[in-house]
Amino acid sequence: MPGERKGFQHRVHREHRGEQTRWDIPRCWSETALDLNLESGNWKRFGGASGAGELSVVRFETERMPPSFDVRVDDLTGTRAEPRGGAENQSVSPGSGTTFYIETFGCQMNAHDSEKVAGVLLGRGYQQVADIEAAKVVFYNTCSIREKAAQKVFSRLGEFRKHPDHGKVIGVLGCVAQQEGEEIFERAPWVSLVCGSASYSKLPTLLAELEAGNRRVTGLDTDTDETFETEITRRDNPFRAYLTIIEGCDKSCAYCVVPYTRGPERSRSSASVLEEVRKLADAGYSEIQLLGQTVNSYRDPAARGMTFAELLVAVAAVRGIRRVRFTTSHPRDFGRDIVEAIDSVPALCDHVHLPVQSGSTRVLRAMQRTYTRDEYLEKIALIRSARRSISVTSDIIVGFPGETEEDVAETLSLLEAAQYDGVFAFQYSPRPNTASLQMGDTIPAEEKGRRLALVQDRQREIQIARNNELVGQTFEVLVDGASRRRASPAGGPGQWAGRTSSNRILNLSSPHAGLLGQYIQVRVTRASPNSLIGEHVN
């Protein structure tokens, strides 16, 4: 592809001659960044680079005005350079040029929220950096679903105690911010900004207040009007995009803080969802992951609007979209129409994440999960009856207050019955503002650990058996990075990693360079409990 690369370089030079001069590669692609080798003396190159022909996102910024252009280099469809987002939304604020850094804890929704935060600040002239040392403003976007996750945040904040003269603005965002509020200032006095997920559009104003001399500022409103309004101007992945379609939760599980930290369920209009999907497709994104705490509870707020299954089909029909994923589903709202949609639309990925939490009906009732063991297994049977082979993953909590040995045995037997392709298992931890907090933490930590090991060991046996059944089969894989098993430099021939439609990780060897972002055929040669190993099939 050398000729195409040169043409791309010339086009960029011609269209942006005299503008400043900087491009940077998003942090997650720093190992596999394409060296553009811009020849003009007006350009300055930042960051590392490696093998030719890879898919990269490159950022250009100007001195005259702030428009930022994300430029996609795509050797599959030919080279092109186009703006993503308009200059009219890029006005410079008094904080223009201030550097910020975001560290994200938790799930995909938090990762997507961090993209929203970056979008808000980039649109006001701030500059995102990948090195915390280079940042004037440091944000920790937090998770509080489990005690360990929240403790990790405060541990990270504690590192600043050793450096009182760091000179940075420290901000706590997300669920811990919403849950703890101003108490964070008491636990970590060097924090100066606390902002919940419903107030991210206010971040430039909060930062301006700090600049004006205020010592501490908060954005902890519960107003949900802005939930879906934040424009994403910079995404962390150049071919896979997150898109939140429902925020909050109405299920009120006894152990869960989400209704408190995220508020009640509210769905985005299908018209707005489809408009953004079309924009993403036009910008070169081929895989969309629809997000929600209970994503399948989606209901279009418009009169006689789309159901979740209808929305899945509509998103998959957008020209340029090759894969559609969704997470996380709640069993109560999971119906036959979703399975039928997956069965009939190839672009809908054949994977469902359906958390069960326990195999015991008695514990499920105590958890307020609104279904029984048998009702849940009926959902699994529905999924397994599909014509396509749909993979199923789940979440399990051990050590819930009052859980007995018999309850644990029922969970282990449910693993056998469900034959999951993957399980995320956790020890119960009491969380503030939850019903289970009043039940006490009745299971000793050592016993929780023993029960967790039982679940993990049994599930490991199931996964290796299921993965071994796939040896010899060929799957389409979206290559999304260099494999941890690689023996050659990132971007060169050797080891790559990607995901199948069923969301299995597949490490693969290939004689070809430049596979990042490509859909390729891979034959499985070996299996492990958590991934597959295969060879690129030409």
What are these regions (language model features)?
Residues 181, 292-301, 334-337, 356-367, ...:
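Flexible glycine/acidic-rich beta-alpha junction loops that bind and position SAM and/or redox cofactors
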Residues 57-298, 307, 337, 342, ...:
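Proteins enriched for Cys/Gly/acidic motifs involved in redox and nucleic-acid/cofactor modification
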Residues 309, 314-318, 323, 335-394:
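Radical SAM/AdoMet-radical enzyme domain recognition
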Residues 326:
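Intrinsically disordered, low-complexity polar regions and short flexible loop motifs
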Residues 69-71, 438-538:
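Terminal RNA-binding accessory module
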Residues 3, 10-21, 27-39, 43-44, ...:
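Short, low-complexity, charge-dense intrinsically disordered segments
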Residues 149-151, 264-269, 299-305, 366-369, ...:
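Short, solvent-exposed loop/turn segments at secondary-structure boundaries
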